[in-house]
Amino acid sequence: MAALRMLWMGLVLLGLLGFPQTPAQGHDTVQPNFQQDKFLGRWYSAGLASNSSWFREKKAVLYMCKTVVAPSTEGGLNLTSTFLRKNQCETKIMVLQPAGAPGHYTYSSPHSGSIHSVSVVEANYDEYALLFSRGTKGPGQDFRMATLYSRTQTLKDELKEKFTTFSKAQGLTEEDIVFLPQPDKCIQE
């Protein structure tokens, strides 16, 4: 009887405190047997999805960018992205620090100071990679972003479908998803 009472009290406490939520679909999962050396090189950000209000406001003016992934001295990754912004080519460098399993990284935003978890969830290395990032922007403001990297600037319909399904599995909606158009400069070979 005492064991049953303890079980009941435990269930009540979980209900009061908020039962731990399971991720929408493996936020922290990574590509099995992730091979960082095969992930290196040139990628194009062909699709993005995010619950960020900034993203929702700006997604109509975003373009595909070129990202070169190189190893960092700390065992992580340096991502150098070139993109079109206000009719100018700009470059941004992100440093991803290794965090746990191969394919899982953290990124510290110099702008907001927030820390984001970044996972390479799926990659075939020669064609595409699906990444998922999450973090917080402030109290009660969770941030989620799915990214579709492509080795080419042209996407197959199957990849668009795969990315849409992947994004929705992360709790993002159809209006959170955008496939980025190619700009007329900044990402040429």
Curated annotation (Swiss-Prot):
Keywords, in A-Z order: Cytoplasm, Disulfide bond, Endoplasmic reticulum, Fatty acid biosynthesis, Fatty acid metabolism, Glycoprotein, Golgi apparatus, Isomerase, Lipid biosynthesis, Lipid metabolism, Mast cell degranulation, Membrane, Nucleus, Prostaglandin biosynthesis, Prostaglandin metabolism, Pyrrolidone carboxylic acid, Secreted, Signal, Transport
Glycosylation sites: N51, N78
Modified residues (Pyrrolidone carboxylic acid): Q25
EC class (word): isomerase
Catalysed reaction equations from the record: prostaglandin H2 = prostaglandin D2
Deletion phenotype: Mutant mice show decreased susceptibility to passive cutaneous anaphylaxis associated with decreased mast cell degranulation.
Molecular function terms, GO-annotated: fatty acid binding; prostaglandin-D synthase activity; retinoid binding
Location within or outside the cell: Rough endoplasmic reticulum; Nucleus membrane; Golgi apparatus; Cytoplasm, Perinuclear region
Domain of life the protein comes from: Eukaryota
GO cellular component, one term: perinuclear region of cytoplasm
InterPro entries: Calycin (IPR012674), Lipocalin (IPR002345), Lipocalin_CS (IPR022272), Lipocln_cytosolic_FA-bd_dom (IPR000566)
Effect caused by changing C65A: Loss of enzyme activity. No effect on ligand binding
Keyword hit for Membrane: yes
SUPFAM superfamilies: Lipocalins
Record-listed E.C. numbers: 5.3.99.2
Up-regulation conditions: By IL-1 beta and thyroid hormone. Probably induced by dexamethasone, dihydrotestosterone, progesterone, retinoic acid and retinal. Repressed by the Notch-Hes signaling pathway.
PANTHER family (alphabetical): LIPOCALIN, PROSTAGLANDIN-H2 D-ISOMERASE
Function as written in the Swiss-Prot or TrEMBL entry: Catalyzes the conversion of PGH2 to PGD2, a prostaglandin involved in smooth muscle contraction/relaxation and a potent inhibitor of platelet aggregation. Involved in a variety of CNS functions, such as sedation, NREM sleep and PGE2-induced allodynia, and may have an anti-apoptotic role in oligodendrocytes. Binds small non-substrate lipophilic molecules, including biliverdin, bilirubin, retinal, retinoic acid and thyroid hormone, and may act as a scavenger for harmful hydrophobic molecules and as a secretory retinoid and thyroid hormone transporter.
Assembly behavior: Monomer.
Protein name: Prostaglandin-H2 D-isomerase
UniProt source species: Mus musculus (Mouse)
Phylogenetic lineage: Eukaryota, Metazoa, Chordata, Craniata, Vertebrata
